[in-house]
């Protein structure tokens, strides 16, 4: 029920009836015709650029062509007025009957209103969070978690076949550091005096319970094993414990992944998957033996002037070629990236979305180049970067540092301000823009707190129905009866609310296609503002109140409008991952 797509089709049909031709007598390309909300609502309900984009190829004056198109569109049964504006835009004003019928249809769809097929079932992998399994989630992980999860929800609602994925980085050097940190806590649990945690190890107290559990299970047994054997056991236990903690932390934020992919599986069986992926690129001519030029500026300690196995990534859009094998014969981190991306392609995904922190900006070109080399045009890879979140309390900055053990955990933030405030506010800026998060402001009960303002609109919708039940003596209100009464809505404020609701399906499609879930948060705030504004009009003018005891038909019509607002607020908040409350507590 995307009215903008509907009217784009109607405008296109009207243009086709004009039988326009270019200088060669060929019909022009009509794919650039668009119908959108006008920038100024006073200009009408819809605006089309058709005359503007077709004037040049058909050799016509855009305004004269717009006049012809406007004349044709006035014959549409739902168009009350079609007027030419500016250099050649056509503004349409629709009849009240169209909006009333749209409200009735919306009530029929309920919370499925806005669900789309624009994704056409494309198999999509959204990878997000993927924090190292070395400790609890901290607030720095919140933004990527929310952006990735909300985007996946949005795309699924728009018709994509979405898998939410978390890659467990359980094969790197940080896992050795974790294992040694846990062994220290294990020794402490056995009674050893460990003193200060040595530099380079994880000092957080969150490892103490794990050390105690190992002491209870093994006694002194781990100390009596060969070091490598003991470390392997401890690392396995530590990864399991950290991932259980991470899953629990994410659940507090209402984040749940479909797949947890272990990086270790890429290195299993003599790194079979990595070797296979490199062999595949070799057969395609993307691998060669050569030397990398020295990096600009001061050379890093691990740089070597030697012949290496290299991925020719500059041929597919990267800034430099990438090494795949270290001097000791082991594979580089990038080699694991090669195998992991190929694994996703082998699983049938055609849209690969990586949600990463802004500090991973250097990964964008190499991942894009890798996708081109592995799958050509068959796969679309997009990296979304999430900028930093700065924490404040009453305007004063809060500092955090994971390695020092002194950091603000995700759990602490959820317990203080609630899941909904975090989920909504992490989307209230575009993901690549910096975000200030003030604990005091996100718990304010005011219009300046977007999540409160939107949830308050949801609660108000439900309060209207409670009031109507009391005053009319009706326990339940059937959607069909509410929809049937929609023709009674003629007030401009009521029609304006329906217009705002009608933007939702277009918003869903455009936000999903652009991979911008923040648009949903902005829209919900605008819808809540429109609803609160109409509520306030009823406060000043009793004739505009939702419940009119002496006019049951009009009351049912207005209740239908309130139900529609509630449906869209609930739908949008659900996609964001926040609750749509029935009352504020």
Curated annotation (Swiss-Prot):
CDD domains given in the database record? ArgRS_core
User: What reaction is this protein's catalytic activity?
Assistant: tRNA(Arg) + L-arginine + ATP = L-arginyl-tRNA(Arg) + AMP + diphosphate
**Subcellular location, record wording:** Cytoplasm
Motif: 'HIGH' region; annotated at 131-141
Q: Which GO terms describe its biological process?
A: arginyl-tRNA aminoacylation
User: Per its UniProt record, what SMART domains does this chain match?
Assistant: Arg_tRNA_synt_N, DALR_1
Of the GO CC terms on this record, one is: cytoplasm
One Pfam family it belongs to = Arg_tRNA_synt_N
Q: Which Gene3D superfamilies match?
A: Arginyl tRNA synthetase N-terminal domain, HUPs, Isoleucyl-tRNA Synthetase, Domain 1
Q: What is its main location?
A: cytoplasm
* SUPFAM superfamilies in the cross-refs: Anticodon-binding domain of a subclass of class I aminoacyl-tRNA synthetases (SSF47323), Arginyl-tRNA synthetase (ArgRS), N-terminal 'additional' domain (SSF55190), Nucleotidylyl transferase (SSF52374)
Q: Which domain of life is it from?
A: Bacteria
Listed under subunit, the entry gives: Monomer.
Family, similarity comment = Belongs to the class-I aminoacyl-tRNA synthetase family.
Name the chain's protein: Arginine--tRNA ligase
What is the originating organism of this protein? Mesorhizobium japonicum (strain LMG 29417 / CECT 9101 / MAFF 303099) (Mesorhizobium loti (strain MAFF 303099))
What is the primary gene name for this protein? argS
């Amino acid at each position: 029920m995307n009215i903008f797509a509907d009217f784009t089709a109607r405008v296109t049909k009207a243009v086709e009836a004009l039988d326009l031709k270019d200088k060669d007598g060929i019909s022009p390309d009509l794919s650039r015709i668009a119908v959108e909300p006008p920038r100024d609502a006073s200009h009408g309900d819809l605006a089309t650029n058709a005359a503007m984009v077709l004037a040049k190829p058909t050799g016509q004056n855009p305004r004269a062509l717009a006049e012809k198109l406007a004349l044709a569109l006035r014959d549409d049964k739902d168009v009350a007025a079609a007027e030419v504006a500016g250099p050649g835009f056509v503004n349409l004003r629709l009849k009240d009957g169209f909006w009333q019928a749209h409200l009735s249809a919306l009530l029929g769809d309920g919370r499925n209103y806005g669900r789309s097929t624009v994704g056409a079932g494309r198999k999509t992998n959204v990878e997000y969070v993927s924090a190292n399994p070395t400790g609890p989630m901290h607030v720095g992980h919140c933004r990527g978690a929310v952006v990735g999860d909300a985007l996946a929800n949005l795309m699924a609602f728009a018709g994509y076949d979405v898998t939410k994925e978390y890659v467990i980085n359980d094969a790197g050097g940080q896992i050795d550091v974790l294992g040694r940190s846990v062994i220290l806590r294990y020794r402490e649990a056995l009674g050893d005096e460990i003193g200060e945690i040595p530099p380079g190890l994880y000092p957080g107290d969150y490892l103490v319970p794990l050390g105690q559990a190992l002491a209870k299970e093994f006694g002194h047994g781990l100390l009596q094993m060969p070091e490598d054997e003991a470390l392997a056991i401890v690392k396995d236990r530590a990864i399991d414990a950290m991932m259980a903690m991470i899953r629990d932390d994410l659940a507090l934020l209402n984040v749940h992944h479909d797949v947890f992919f272990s990086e270790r599986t890429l290195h299993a069986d003599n790194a079979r998957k990595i070797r296979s992926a490199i062999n595949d690129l070799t057969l395609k001519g993307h691998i060669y033996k050569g030397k990398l030029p020295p990096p600009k500026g001061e050379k890093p300690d691990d740089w070597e002037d030697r012949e290496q196995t290299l991925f020719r990534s500059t041929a597919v859009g990267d800034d430099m070629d990438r090494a795949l094998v270290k001097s000791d014969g082991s594979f580089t981190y990038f080699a694991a990236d090669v195998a992991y991306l190929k694994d996703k392609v082998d699983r049938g995904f055609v849209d690969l979305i990586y949600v990463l922190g802004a500090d991973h900006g250097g990964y964008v070109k190499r991942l894009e180049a890798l996708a081109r080399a592995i799958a050509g045009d068959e796969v679309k890879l997009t990296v979304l970067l999430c900028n930093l979140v700065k924490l404040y309390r009453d305007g004063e900055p809060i500092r955090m540092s994971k390695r020092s053990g002194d950091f603000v955990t995700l759990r602490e933030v959820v317990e203080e301000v609630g899941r909904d405030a975090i989920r909504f506010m992490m989307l209230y800026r575009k993901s690549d823009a910096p975000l200030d998060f003030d604990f005091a402001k996100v718990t304010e009960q005011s219009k300046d707190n977007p999540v409160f303002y939107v949830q308050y609109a949801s609660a108000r919708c439900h309060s209207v129905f409670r009031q109507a039940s009391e005053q009319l003596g009706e326990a339940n209100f059937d959607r069909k009866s509410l929809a049937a009464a929609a023709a009674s809505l003629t007030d401009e404020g009521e029609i304006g609310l329906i217009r705002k609701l009608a933007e939702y399906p277009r918003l869903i499609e455009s936000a999903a296609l652009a991979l911008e879930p923040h648009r949903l948060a902005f829209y919900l705030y605008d819808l809540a503002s429109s609803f609160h504004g109409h509520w306030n009009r009823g406060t000043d003018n009793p004739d505009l109140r939702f419940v009119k005891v002496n006019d049951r038909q009009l009351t049912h019509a207005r209740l239908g409008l309130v139900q529609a607002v509630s449906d869209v607020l609930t739908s949008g908040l659900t996609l964001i991952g926040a609750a749509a409350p029935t009352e504020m507590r």
